[in-house]
């Protein structure tokens, strides 16, 4: 054991010398192998094996170094290498023995250490108390996980690239090389698409094409009747350039050609001139004074122009010219009529207008760049700038004091006219609004109204609206008061705690009318009004709408809901609105809270009174018996198990209330009727009627399964002799069908179940022998047989031995008529021939069978 460290020290010293003999490539290879061995030894945790592996590696590399030293050619290096090799072999032999002894001693320790380490790892993983990983461990785990995911992603990317490469190889292998013949055929087909042989044949003259001649040019017979060139020249003018041609209206051309309008008037219509605007039109202020002409120059130019005569001047001479110019600057809306201002103010306004015209010239040059709507807007803007409304502020309206007797008024009636102590002294008090008179305009004394200048003769204008302007648009401009409160002076009256008891308003009044004084009337200014200005539909006199009270509403409801007309028909509730309640908005009056005074009862006097004075009413007790179900025949369960409920009979007042309610009840209301269920017997009868189908029912004509070409079903022959003794029907009715009608087979049905409109008996109706004979007698003519005289009148009856009595009548001999020639094909008898009843029945039977 003592020689072990010595051997290790010698080994380390020799390794430094040995490294000098290695080349750089061999040293790198040696380091890589040594690192790999050390990692393998660390995983196995076997110290002995790792040391042995390192010694083996050194022994393996020493001969390599020795061989490389031989190649150098130096003799000294060879001797040193041999000496080192001999020393190493001796040390290795001694070391192997020591290592063998060491391994023998420590052979079981490694296995024990491995087992304990595995047990500790298992306990750490499965133990309940585990140590939480630190931040460094968590970071390391995340890095390892990220590296693992990145490696997996790279692996998947490599696999994907490999698959793509494999597919490329497959596609490259699938490419088929075409032969040269196929390529030439494809080129030939492509060349055929652009072949120009046909064009060359046409150009060379091999193919002759048909020549289409041009349309013949006919000689002009005369002017074109639809030519409007002359009208265009007349309207547009000959000086216009061809590039600026415009479309000419066909109507204007017709007027010019027919002579209705002259050329000058047509040119004026085609090029209308804009009318000169009056008033201030300077929208650009003083910046465009030099660019525009003055209005005076434009007026002078228009006055110097000579008027052109046309056909319409003759009509203008007959009409009287109005000397009053038309003022277009006046707005058309309703405006207030101004009072006539003094002459001095008018002169000042005219002077100001002239100065404004000089400063703001007319901009008529720029009319071509504007529209008519812009011109109207400009006029309104200029008018709003120049027009100044005179507004007079009325601080207080002076009203005449009304003199009324004060004896009839109480002291509290003037409380609303008293001044309040908390009112601000500087702010004037707003007067109450004046009461509007019943008719006429609303005029307040002391107020100045703003209006425009009145026309000179308003009576001559049939469209004068001065009266309407006075009535509609009279405004009084008062001083602004933002803090005005119209109800500030009113005293807040607290509502009474006890509501007044309801009383009948129609029974009479309990108030003393002598103490009632009418309210003071506000003084108004009376205006004399002519009878022509009276408006029959004027509602200005109505100051407030009086709503109907509860009594009036009840009368109206009674008239509308319970109104009985001439026929005695009572109006009911509307079926379209069943939930209508006319008293839904009416609040129920609160019952007055009255304090009841408890009086001490005198028992002595109460005992002395008779029972008649106590007004004792007898009460009748009844019992509520459940009504029996009349339709439920099979639900009789015996007597009712529920005990009877006693109740008191209603009084007369309640009966009257119920009668009133019954008047308003809908007669067709079925909401109170309980749901009636069918009994078992009724259900059985209905099932029997639905399931059992009678045999004599036939298919409907609309039956999809009906086959008109199907062979008829064989009908058994009728037994005409099987007839009952009691015959109650016609003679020609078949007996078998009659049995079905009378139900002689004993089906159990009564005669009441017979359908009087049943036509099933006429299904197979055929005429009898008697009917056929009657038809033959009607269709065939009768042949009269000649009756010859059997007895001779002249001969004696006794002689002949006939034995006739004396009084036996004898037929007289008639002269024989000649035989008539009867035509067997004569149809004159069949002119008015109509089918008989039997034929109609046959036709019906045939149609029904089909």
From Swiss-Prot:
Q: Where is this region: Disordered?
A: 1-95, 125-164, 345-375, 412-498, 573-610, 634-673, 738-760, 800-825
Q: Where is the composition biased (Pro residues)?
A: 431-440
Q: Motif DPF 4 located where? A: 666-668
| DPF 2, short sequence motif: residues | 461-463
Q: Which segment of this protein is annotated as the motif DPF 1?
A: 224-226
Which stretches are tagged as biased composition: Basic and acidic residues?
A: 28-38, 136-164, 574-588, 596-607
| UniProt effect for mutating residue 35 to M | In stn-TS2; induce behavioral defects. Homozygous adults are viable but exhibit sluggish and uncoordinated behavior
Q: Where is the composition biased (Polar residues)?
A: 78-91
Q: Where is the composition biased (Acidic residues)?
A: 451-462
What note about domains is in the entry?
The Asp-Pro-Phe (DPF) motifs, which are found in many presynatic proteins, are thought to mediate an interaction with AP-2alpha.
User: What other comment is given for this protein?
Assistant: StnB, which is involved in the same pathway, is derived from the same bicistronic transcript that encodes these two different proteins.
Oligomeric state and interaction partners are given as: Interacts with the second C2 domain of Syt.
Record protein name field: Protein stoned-A
The organism of origin for this protein? Drosophila melanogaster
Its taxonomic placement starts with: Eukaryota, Metazoa, Ecdysozoa, Arthropoda, Hexapoda
